[in-house]
UniProtKB/Swiss-Prot annotation:
HAMAP family: DNA_HJ_migration_RuvB. One of its GO terms (cellular component) is Holliday junction resolvase complex. It is found in: Cytoplasm. DNA binds at R322, R327. It catalyses: ATP + H2O = ADP + phosphate + H(+). It comes from Neisseria meningitidis serogroup B (strain ATCC BAA-335 / MC58). This is Holliday junction branch migration complex subunit RuvB. Disulfide bonds: none annotated. Keywords: ATP-binding, Cytoplasm, DNA damage, DNA recombination, DNA repair, DNA-binding, Hydrolase, Nucleotide-binding. Residues 267-343 are annotated as: Head domain (RuvB-H). ATP binds at L32, R33, G74, K77, T78, T79, E140, D141, Y142, R183, Y193, R230. It comes from the Bacteria. Has 3 domains, the large (RuvB-L) and small ATPase (RuvB-S) domains and the C-terminal head (RuvB-H) domain. The head domain binds DNA, while the ATPase domains jointly bind ATP, ADP or are empty depending on the state of the subunit in the translocation cycle. During a single DNA translocation step the structure of each domain remains the same, but their relative positions change. Homohexamer. Forms an RuvA(8)-RuvB(12)-Holliday junction (HJ) complex. HJ DNA is sandwiched between 2 RuvA tetramers; dsDNA enters through RuvA and exits via RuvB. An RuvB hexamer assembles on each DNA strand where it exits the tetramer. Each RuvB hexamer is contacted by two RuvA subunits (via domain III) on 2 adjacent RuvB subunits; this complex drives branch migration. In the full resolvosome a probable DNA-RuvA(4)-RuvB(12)-RuvC(2) complex forms which resolves the HJ.
Length: 343
């Protein structure tokens, strides 16, 4: 039986959260994951560049240059890493920045790589400084420099490594140190998806899950998925549950709308937490500007939750502005709630 991961937040995971909520969800994601660049939907610019770089590396018989994938969570960075390894015809070893606590943890991974293999480090911005220092010569010269022993008896040992490709993924490229960032020869930013591509992704997932779904049903799910495939696939599974009970398993536009409305996800992809925040700015503070601490106190959320979880999507979609004087609701926010626009 699969166990749900412990979440750091005290509140339940939002259905529109871009992070993976549980081990079971991660397992389902893997089942829906495309296996080749041709199957990968969206991110056309990144795909085109990677296809050329991969073909060139294979033609020369070399390891692919180190790759940095960055962008918001849930856009397919892990999927792309697996696809790159498959397209290269090599093995992939996967880990994450917080797991690599000591230099020996990284050394154990690197010394077990075969020539041209891919090492994928998720959340690479969370590498400890000591591990990052060990990584530099490995990336530049395919060599490990490690210290054995302590005090006067300590000595440096150099270990040659096979040529390999590091793929780093991060949601916070700005937190990478300059020396680490400069060692990536290929840098790709993943963007939020257009509704058109999300509709295709939802339709593909429905086929893999053997669901009876109309084009309108796929479009309804896509437009509420906040530009994020992970959210789209999660909403699809919840709509499937609703359709199984209410409509003999058939998902059309009306069923998708009813299911998502029941889940409090509106037509713009906003959930209860988003609306609670915007309504506080609009009704309690006259649309702003208002300081972050005041809004946090008004809605009973921490400032960290507001900055990291609530605000990014609202700003990206044009519902909110951050100004030197505080947060301000935009014209789009007024219109969304049917309020007269403040002049």
């Amino acid at each position: 039986m699969l166990q749900t991961d412990n979440l750091t937040a005290a509140q339940p995971q939002r259905i529109v959260a871009a992070q993976t909520a549980s081990a079971q969800e991660e397992l389902l994601e893997r089942a829906l994951r495309p296996k080749t660049l041709d199957d990968y939907i969206g991110q056309d610019k990144a795909k085109e560049q990677l296809a050329i770089f991969i073909q060139a590396a294979k033609k020369r018989g070399e390891a692919l240059d180190h790759v940095l994938l960055f962008g918001p969570p849930g856009l397919g960075k892990t999927t792309l890493a697996h696809i790159i390894a498959k397209e290269l015809g090599v093995n992939l070893r996967q880990t994450s920045g917080p797991v690599l606590e000591r230099a020996g943890d990284l050394a154990a991974l690197l010394t077990n790589l075969d020539p041209h293999d891919v090492l994928f480090i998720d959340e690479i911005h969370r590498l400890s400084p000591v591990v990052e220092e060990i990584l530099y010569p490995a990336l530049e010269d395919y060599r490990l420099d490690i210290m054995i022993g302590e005090g006067p008896a300590a000595r440096s040992v150099k270990i040659d490594l096979p040529p390999f490709t590091l793929i780093g993924a991060t949601t916070r490229a700005g937190m990478l140190t300059n020396p680490l960032r400069d060692r990536f020869g290929i840098v790709s930013r993943l963007e939020f998806y257009e509704n058109r591509d999300l509709t295709t992704i939802v339709s593909r997932s429905a086929q893999l899950l053997q669901l009876d779904m109309s084009e309108e049903g796929a479009e309804e799910i896509a437009k509420r998925s906040r530009g994020t495939p992970r959210i789209a696939n999660r909403l699809l599974r919840r709509v499937r549950d609703f359709a199984d009970v209410k409509n003999n398993g058939t998902i059309d536009g009306g069923i998708a709308d009813a299911a998502l409305s029941m889940l409090d996800v509106d037509a713009q992809g906003l959930d209860v937490m988003d609306r609670k925040f915007l309504e506080a700015v609009l009704h309690k503070f006259g649309g702003g500007p208002v300081g972050l601490d005041n809004v946090a106190a008004a809605i009973g959320e921490s400032t960290d939750t507001i900055e990291d979880v609530i605000e990014p999507y609202l700003i990206q979609q044009g519902f909110l502005q951050r100004t030197p004087r505080g947060r301000m609701a935009t014209e789009r926010a007024y219109l969304h709630f049917g309020l007269p626009v403040e002049k």
